[in-house]
């Protein structure tokens, strides 16, 4: 589509719930909506990165299914995390190799938490894609931190789980996909039978506090998940398919309310 406005896509973190992002992308492709610039945190960085280099939504779903996070040989015995982040980088290397963010066909911004300074870091576009994505996805306590240029990084979601502000001024129309549930408060839970469950709960509480204001920055904010029925680390392929479908249906349902807005912003676009 020529002479169109630029469209941005902000993707939040959420572990395997990030497959809802891929479902949204499937719907956007069917509507001939082309994304020009992407920002992603954690799972959003994974999905956004894969899409930015040309992977189709179905291929993104297959990638998630192929990653065996909790395989015994991924365990970390000498690093600060249950799992060795280098093992995840190996998965990413198959797709990205030595590609840098600047080499992507689509403009991509990825954030992580700098453990040394305690501040949010949006990586230079000359950072290797596999390293930036792994750093942004290094869930604290689960994955070991990722070192880039002498600094240690972990999950960007700690400080900014929904990075809409990063590209707000870099596009004309901003679509956001926020995997936070539509519940306004953190749902009470009493099931803490493992270290992993405690860590996940602590991060859930923290992330809940830093996403609300970002929704308002989007011209169209999609909220695929209505409850906490799905885990951050799903292992069932059937449930992964369900999450993908939830993203697709949420985008489909919300599209009618923004169709006119999109057409007005870009009269030359051929939206179905």
Question: What positions do the PLM features span?
Answer:
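Patatin-like phospholipase
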Residues: 1-41, 49-272
